[in-house]
Amino acid sequence: MKTRYSVLSVAMTAAFYTQYAQADLREQCLLGVPHFQGEEVTGDQTMMPIEIEADNAVINQPKDATYTGDVAIKQGNRSLFADEVRVEQNGEQERRAFLKGSYRYQDNLVQAHGRDAAMDLGSETAELQNTEFQLVGRQGRGTAESGLFNHNKRILKNATFTACLPNDNAWSIEGNEMIQHIDEEYAEIWHARFKVLGMPVFYSPYLQFPIGDRRRSGLLIPNFHRSSKDGFAYSQPFYWNIAPNMDATITPTYYSRRGWQISPEYRYLTKLGEGIVAGEYIGKDRLDEYRPDDNDRKRYLMHWRHNMSFLTGWRLYVDYTKVSDKRYFSDFDSEYGSSTDGYATQQFKLGYYQPNYNLSISGKKFQTFDELDVGPYRVLPQIDFNYYNDELVKGGDFKLFAQTARFENDSKLMPKAWRFHVEPTLNFPLANRYGSLNFETKLYATHYLQEKGSSKQADDMDKNVTRIIPQVKVDLQTVLEADKQLFKGFNQTFEPRVQYVYRPYKDQSNIGSGLNQSVSFGYDSALLQSDYFSLFNDRRYSGLDRISSANLITAGGTNRFFNEKTGVEVFNFSIGQTYYLSPSKIDDLSQNSTTKRSSSWALESNWKFHRKWNWHGAYQYDTRLNQTSLANTSLQYKPSQDKLVQLSYRFASKDYINQNLRSNTYGQDIKQVGAVVGWELTDRVAFMASHYHDIALKKPVESQLSVNYNTCCWSANVYVARKLTATPIGSPDTINDLYYDNKFGVNFELRFGTNYSSGVRKMLKKGMIPYTEQYGIN
């Protein structure tokens, strides 16, 4: 009988057997580079005294002197060692040292050795012949037939350079002339030949590369992958360091089944703010499965993110993402969106902020990827005003929120509207060492100016709608500490909370159209998803178009356990439920009303039973349907930042999905298990493996395996992945018809002594379902 092992099980086993990696890679790499001995001195080196030591000296004052036998010349931070040195002096104007035979030169930035050299003792300049050099305190070494070294520049002839340690010739760059700019931390090279293991693989008439922490313009290492959908793909990124405050990366990619894609990305930091502008473009997608229109097969993405603070109190925020079609994120991996998001956001906000008030104008639009007859509304403009004053009423905190918004929809069936909203709130908080009591009154006052859709089939609308709803809320909280320990070594607290909310009923069916209830109610309201903490929200719906009636009591509590010695929280458990004294509704339709006297039970818990172990669980029981509506749990072992194992499970009933997503076509429960391993096996090898499986469908959702190999001067990543993808056009699209994209890829990275990461965190971010942490105790 043969035994079968999954990739993930082998990966998890390997992880547990390599809990102790070798010494940190950075420490190992820096052990292989020279370090400056002694104390660095600052100031003009040429004005510092010259110390000369030698076994013998022949001095011909005042013109020259010849020193032989273990000669050492020291001035400031630089030293020169040779068998024979002749020093010539021309009055006080010039002092030069000439070295015959082998020599060693060192300062606080570089060490070198070779044959024959000259050093100007009055200008910090050294001319070195047939030299081998190595940077001090960082990776970088090379050779040159001749070199002119000074305090801010090294000019090398017929030179080589590599960031690899001695005796490691993994890669190198050769050129007829190389100029190393010390302060700017980059090098220029002419007629550059890039070699791997001594074999030339690339030529460029001119090239720049970093010799420090700052990035420089030039070609980056290409990436390769092959997938069942794209075919073979080759990416060649080019980095452009435009200025100290702005740069760009331009990446052409060739897909054998799709054609050429160009992906520019521009990053900036100016007085007008900081942000990123990016794009992805294919002029004509050749893939036969993609046939929306044979005359228009362009695929593109546009992205702009901007943050700006200016004058006093002014802020501007822009987040704009637009794609050519609904399938874009299913077909292409992108940093600017994912197929699991379901939409792309296009929004901006300009605001003025002061300590007790703020004013903003904004706009927002969603590009959805679902097949919907009627999409969500766009809002432009939206003007918000917030005002705070805790001295207006004695013992009370006054707050005022006001908004004006304009809503429009692409569908001619849908109405347009202006919404004017005012929401004053008055809080009376009371608190002492036993707990807190907050009494709140609020008024929702809203007026709508509605315009019927332009289509003849559009619903008739009330042109003017006014809605005024008062609200009263009482919130009581306290913290009780147990006198006795339930478990030895752990102190226990219980935090009960009771909240009462009252709002009268107002029929709101005349606000907006019922045609888009698969997306929202009215113009921007949707039923909120619930968990323990959302039980204490004032409202069941987001936005302002649906404010349900309320006559309810919410009761809950959190039990916490703390380590008696350290005071650190190790366990908590929360449970709560809402009790409806009368049905909560927004109109006369039964499906939009609470029919039971109580809501779902909501439970949430976190347990850190060891500093390396975390557990989280959440559960909701629907009392209306007498069944579980939501559940999720995850267990994580994380001994360090680059070592973790996580197991997870999530469940959502089809009734809960249908209630919260009217356009749902899933037709059954979601039952999904997942496992993720990210582990630094040694200082050089790390891997990530993940697998998500749908129990209901009995089919995988996504599987990944990625291995990273790191050295001091390069790293390589090899990965395989299999994930669900969009249904090809013209193919069957039922619950049992699932389509996968299989991918294999290789990425290389040159390291110039500035990046020693294992790559685990980068690998964890990849995939359709990226790794997340949701633990309430850290």
UniProtKB/Swiss-Prot annotation:
Name of the protein this chain belongs to: LPS-assembly protein LptD
The residues forming the signal peptide are 1-23
Protein family per UniProt: Belongs to the LptD family.
Give its localization.
Cell outer membrane
- Keyword Membrane in annotation: yes
**Record bears the keyword Signal:** yes
Record's GO cellular component terms:
cell outer membrane; transporter complex
Free-text function comment from the UniProt entry: Together with LptE, is involved in the assembly of lipopolysaccharide (LPS) at the surface of the outer membrane.
Q: How does it assemble?
A: Component of the lipopolysaccharide transport and assembly complex. Interacts with LptE and LptA.
According to its UniProt entry, this protein's organism is Actinobacillus pleuropneumoniae serotype 3 (strain JL03)
Q: Which InterPro entries match?
A: LipoPS_assembly_LptD, LptD, LptD_C, OstA-like_N
Q: What keywords is this UniProt entry annotated with?
A: Cell outer membrane, Membrane, Signal
> What's any GO biological process attached to this entry?
lipopolysaccharide transport
